[in-house]
Amino acid sequence: TTPLPVLVADAFAYHERPGALQRLTPPWESVSLESSDQSLHVGSEVVLKTRFAGVPLRWVARHTEYDPPRHFADTQVSGPFASWNHHHEFRERVGAQPESGASLTDLVEYELPMGALVDFCGSSIAQRKIESMFAYRHRVTADDLQLIARYRSAPLRFAISGSSGLVGSNLTRLLTLLGHQATPIVRSKGHSSSDENDCAIAAWSDASEIEKFSDVDVVVHLAGKSIAGGRWSEQGKQQIRDSRVVKTRQLCESLATLKRKPKVLICASATGIYGDRGDTVLDESSSPGDDF
């Protein structure tokens, strides 16, 4: 059980928002969404791709109870457990103000596969993993609800380069959860992941497609050659730099040709901007380094 700083109805509604499931999946878990009915109603299903003991598995969950804003439940149809039943309970906290007095309780009943031996040997490991997962979920839920309450605005259309990366994928989930439209953009067809190319609104180096950016409110530019992709040879460092400097210039020049330009362009790089600072604690107000 965890306290939540909102009304019970808002706490329940959070779980119905698009992208909530992906947002609540811990980054250390090997779980990805294959398909979803985008609903908590009885009979709706979610299909996840996961691994058990290194073996790829599909986890199919079906919603079995739906009583807004108090309760919903799901059960495993097939997957890594012998059985799994998950109940989500939303209540007012005794003595708390209604606008900040909700609580969320997750009740999980499960059985491990392959009988008593696995139950005996693996139950404590499974219990710790489940407790860690729900500690993460509860913290993210509380933080997101505070964020939603703080930034209530009309939905915006975001175009994001590098949307399949660590930062881009998490930003996309968060923006979707907040009610915005977050769509990948690519430099050119065939130069990014297949997932990005399948749903990208435009390739910014293609003059015939740049007009598609006219309907975008915000462009977030995160694309760049990975700094962890190999040894930092002189050639590799030049590629890392060019992927940020040259490609960013190309994107800006392409956007500048539009009659109706995006209102905002955000270009972000990662911790490399600060250079080698040893054990110094760094944040957005820290000065940049002077090395590569």
Predicted stretch roles:
Residues 161, 216-222, 266-268:
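Rossmann-fold scaffold of SDR-type NAD(P)-dependent oxidoreductases
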Residues 1-41:
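Hydrophobic ligand-binding cavity/cleft-lining segments
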Residues 200-250:
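NAD(P)H-binding glycine-rich loop region in Rossmannoid oxidoreductase-like domains
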Residues 158-178:
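N-terminal Rossmann NAD(P)H-binding glycine-rich loop of SDR-like oxidoreductase domains
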Residues 249-291:
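Conserved Rossmann-fold NAD(P)-dependent oxidoreductase catalytic core, especially the SDR/UDP-sugar
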Residues 73-131:
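Beta-strand/loop substructures that line and gate deep hydrophobic ligand-binding cavities in soluble
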Residues 22, 32-80, 95-103:
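Glycine-rich portal/gate segments that line the openings of hydrophobic small-molecule binding cavities
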